[in-house]
């Protein structure tokens, strides 16, 4: 009886979520035993990025899994894509299902004007906010917001199961200082960030060969809205993968951006950046095109590969395993994560069947220099699969 109360009722229960979630969400499934019901997002074939969850997709997932306990929504995704959060909340609540929002990259949504709706304003039940990303606090400091339908004291009990008993007052102080700063100057700060991002998009697009995308992607469904503070740039048309441009910016121009993937780079513009920093980035990208551009033959686009979930993440993670080379693992069930970090979205998760396409994608990402994580083998030459 006790197990069936509140948010604790997750063991062997289902949670509806997009596959392009951060590894921390899937780590939670390993710990609690919940079973994922993936809403496989659309893919922008050119940009190689996963889009948002369409309301019809969520409705079908709820219809097929009426006992699901929660829906998890990225708001926004790493690339700035937003789903129709208000509609998802309304639909889920009508079926007695909680809505959780991953707002790791959405602190500013609570303070900006003309930005996508934030989780709490949309009626979400809980929202995880990484203040250290766009809010200005120290790395590792975050905030968990709860709605009226969630008992904060119960949430505190759950958090205490895994949280350190030796809290860092340095981190707590930085959270409070950042909270105060945003309460007093958040709107003007993020208005300036959005203005710099728009300026950067226009300047980068004028170079040619790059595509810095923004609200022009919005289609009202899989891209319901776009976070204009994000500066995501498609690079394949100059013949370089995003990770290659990322490396050049760091090694040749002393510019450290957020990350590069197979097709794109992401520059995270913060409240501490200045227009001079934007000018340096634009100038470096112009230089890279002039000095390093080449024919794009042989470059792969990023792609979304629908996962086949064979067993639950928890069962796979704790199962007996054996080690196989990536090529020899095709057809087996993965017992571990494989991901490029950042962004930390698993290419492969425990319990998913390894296909030829997944194996080839892992090998290509390694070849291009992506930082690979999640595997027991630090060189990512072998994968742990179910024995």
Locate the predicted segments by residue.
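Conserved C-terminal alpha-helix-loop-beta "cap" of PLP-dependent enzymes
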Residues: 205-374
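Single conserved hydrophobic/aromatic residue that forms the stacking wall/gate
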Residues: 1-11
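Hydrophobic side chains in beta-strands
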Residues: 73, 144-146, 233-235, 269, ...
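Loop/helix-junction capping segments adjacent to catalytic residues or to phosphate/diphosphate-binding pockets
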Residues: 1, 23, 79-82, 136, ...
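Surface-exposed interaction regions enriched in Ser/Thr/Asp/Glu
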Residues: 15, 285, 369-387
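Conserved PLP-enzyme active-site core in the AAT-like
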Residues: 9-217
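Acidic-residue sensor for enzyme active/binding pockets
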Residues: 3, 103, 258
């Amino acid at each position: 009886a006790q197990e069936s109360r509140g948010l604790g009722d997750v063991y062997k229960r289902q949670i509806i979520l997009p596959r392009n979630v951060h590894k921390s969400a899937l780590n939670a499934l390993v710990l609690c035993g919940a079973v994922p019901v993936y809403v496989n997002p659309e893919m922008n074939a050119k940009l190689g990025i996963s889009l948002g969850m369409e309301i019809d997709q969520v409705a079908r997932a709820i219809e097929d899994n009426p006992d699901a306990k929660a829906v998890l929504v990225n708001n926004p995704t790493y690339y700035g894509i937003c789903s129709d959060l208000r509609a998802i909340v309304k639909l889920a609540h009508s079926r007695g299902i909680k809505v959780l929002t991953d707002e790791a990259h959405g602190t500013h949504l609570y303070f900006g004007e003309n930005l996508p709706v934030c989780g709490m304003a949309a009626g979400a039940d809980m929202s995880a906010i990484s203040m250290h990303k766009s809010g200005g606090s120290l790395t590792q400091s975050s905030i968990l917001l709860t709605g009226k339908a969630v008992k904060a004291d119960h949430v505190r009990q759950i958090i205490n199961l895994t949280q350190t008993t030796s809290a860092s007052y340095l981190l707590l102080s930085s959270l409070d200082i950042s909270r105060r700063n945003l309460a007093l100057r958040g709107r003007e700060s993020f208005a300036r960030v959005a203005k710099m991002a728009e300026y950067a998009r226009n300047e980068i697009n004028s170079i040619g060969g790059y595509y810095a995308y923004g609200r022009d992607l919005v289609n009202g469904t899989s891209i319901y809205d776009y976070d204009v503070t994000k500066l995501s740039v498609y690079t394949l048309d100059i013949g370089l993968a995003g990770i290659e441009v990322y490396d050049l910016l760091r090694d040749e121009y002393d510019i450290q951006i957020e990350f590069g993937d197979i097709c794109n780079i992401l520059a995270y513009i913060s409240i501490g950046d200045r227009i001079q920093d934007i000018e340096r980035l634009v100038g470096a990208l112009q230089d890279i095109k002039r000095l390093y551009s080449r024919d794009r033959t042989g470059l792969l686009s990023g792609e979304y590969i629908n996962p086949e979930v064979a067993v639950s993440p928890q069962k796979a993670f704790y199962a007996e395993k054996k080690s196989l080379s990536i090529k020899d693992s095709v057809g087996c069930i993965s017992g571990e994560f494989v991901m490029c970090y950042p962004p930390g979205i698993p290419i492969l998760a425990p319990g998913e069947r390894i296909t030829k396409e997944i194996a080839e994608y892992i090998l290509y990402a390694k070849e291009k220099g992506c930082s690979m994580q999640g595997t027991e083998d630090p060189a990512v030459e072998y994968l742990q699969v179910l024995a």
